[in-house]
């Protein structure tokens, strides 16, 4: 089991990590 980390910034409203959604200003698990 790999852990999904969603710490990227999403100022453009898009998250490139699978399973993450934009919760400005960073991506979070959906």
Swiss-Prot record:
GO terms for biological process: defense response to bacterium. Disulfide bonds join 6-20, 10-22, 15-27. Keywords: Antibiotic, Antimicrobial, Disulfide bond, Knottin, Plant defense. There is a cross-link at residues 1-30 (Cyclopeptide (Gly-Asn)). The keyword Disulfide bond applies. Expressed in root nodules but not in seed. PROSITE patterns: CYCLOTIDE. The presence of a 'disulfide through disulfide knot' structurally defines this protein as a knottin. This is Cliotide T19.
């Amino acid at each position: 089991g790999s852990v999904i980390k969603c710490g990227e910034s999403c100022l453009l409203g898009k998250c490139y990590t699978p399973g993450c959604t934009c919760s400005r200003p960073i991506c979070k698990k959906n």
